[in-house]
């Protein structure tokens, strides 16, 4: 059999990232969120934390009355990265990480009620969160990978 014609067909598939509906932030609580970017999220006080299967755990410190959200990125969003003195523009981070332009607007971010970015799923965590618990950390963000 000749190898000619063996590679004539190309199949492309496009999958939704799970865009947050509209521009309204979705509040994260102790219950699991819907799936965004292949993961689901929950935020709870450290005292209520139980290890979840197939999950990344991010510890951080925030006021006890804080609220947390998942939303699409907004113009001017900045994230403080580990090892940096100044926050980096999220738009620049997405360029540096080679995120395709059509995906950038719908990429979810995890924020506090003061619009501080904690995590850009699949890209980078903020310097405010750590996978190791530190003194004073009173909140836990759990990122569970969706098993399809």
Language-model segment annotations:
Residues 1-148:
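AMP-forming adenylation/ATP pyrophosphatase catalytic core
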